[in-house]
Amino acid sequence: MKAFIVFTRIPVENKTKTRLLPYYTGKQCVGLHTAMLYDMAETIEKLDTSIKTYIYYLPEGDLSILKNIFGEKAEYRKQTGESLGDKMYNAISEVLSEGAEMVSLSGTDIPELSSTDVESSFKLLMQNDTVLFPTEDGGYYLVGMKKAHKDIFNIEGYGGNTVFEKTRARIEKLGLSLGIGTIHRDIDTKEDIKAFYELMYTDENFRKTHTAKFLKENKKIGIIIPTYNEEETVVSLQKQLENLRERCEIVFVDGGSTDKTVELIDTSKFRLLHSKKGRNNQMNMGAESVEADILFFLHCDSILPPNPLEEILDLMEKYRAGCFGIAFKSLSPLMFICRYISNHRVFDRKVMFGDQGIIIEKDLFMEIGMYPDLPIMEDYQLSLTLKEKGIKLGMAKHRIYTSARRFKGGPVRKLKLMWKMNRLRAKYRRGVDIEEISAMYKDVR
């Protein structure tokens, strides 16, 4: 008989995945662990029927949680022993003593673990006395053997970055043969979480897992709103953001407003920072202030679609940067043309602008140096920098409606302004002094 032992604890708040605190709350840590347990259960379902499964668990918590996930086919037993090494040895020794010919034991925090990995451990055991499957951080996630060897587990510092090498050295010292399996990454730290975000962009199979779904839904979003003389729009925007406060960080960064903007921001509900004027300065300050995975830069005169956070998370499942499409609260045919050009430009020219609501990974934003120190064109240059780095842009499903306050007047005036904006960007690309371009732009606020 072949036996597969799953080593886990019952998901209990503030007991499981505690190394992820405070990046995740205790409740989120339980959610992540539970997602990984469901993935493990699906892996077990795919195993050859000749492999018997045992769930060895720490006794804290309600066992029915595990039984609801793994079902009645598995056999459930409490872990015994003082150290982690003792617990693993006792479990393997017990199962071997009951007639198993070979045993593999794995933890549950390996999102990439597949039935192929488990079955390959038994194939390796047919040719070796022991097997180890290493983790990227220097540990191992699976150990297997045909006879119980206590000395293999008598090492200090489980959880350190030398566990795999120390264990291999003990196996060699005992004169046992060793098969080494596929290396995978486990989830213990914030850095591990970010590594699996990267995997989500490239691995469609991983995106289908319970773990990937949890990671996607629990990415932290920071909304940064630069303000300057926005007394006519800031109250309306706060009403839109009211129901989002519990699910993300929201920061207003004022650039020295001379009207009532600052006093109209409800600081009992929203964080307010003060910066020197300039959207680049304001947005950079806001970005640095939030503990977020995703940054969403939002202009104050925007009207959001119904479920903006869900749209952002859907977008950032596949892209590292992107935006919403733009629309205008105007019936002017020219504004419809402007809308089409702006949205098409994201895919055609790989350029997005601030009024579309720029969305970007915080790590990527910091890596490229944040918004450049420019009085104007900071969003344009950000897009050019991303384009140079080969970053693909995505677009959310629905549109942000934004004010057409810059496009006042009749069709001729609107056309002249659109042409002027095009020429200003051309001047910037040619290297015309940015102060000259800024003077031509004229802030309407």
What would you call each of these model-derived segments?
Residues 124-130, 307-333:
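Conserved donor NDP-sugar-binding/catalytic core segment of glycosyltransferases
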Residues 376-382:
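Acidic donor-binding loop at a coil-to-helix junction in glycosyltransferase catalytic cores
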Residues 59-62, 254-262, 302:
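A conserved acidic beta->alpha catalytic loop
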Residues 12-45, 229-243:
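Short, well-formed alpha-helical segments that are part of the catalytic scaffolds
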Residues 131-137, 323-330, 342-360:
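A recurrent flexible, glycine/aromatic-enriched loop bordering the glycosyltransferase active site
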Residues 103, 295:
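Short aromatic/hydrophobic "clamp" motif used to bind/position activated sugar donors
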Residues 108-121, 260, 300-314, 384:
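Acidic donor-binding/catalytic loop of UDP-sugar-dependent glycosyltransferases
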Residues 85-91, 274-290:
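Glycine-rich, basic loop-to-helix element that forms the pyrophosphate-binding segment
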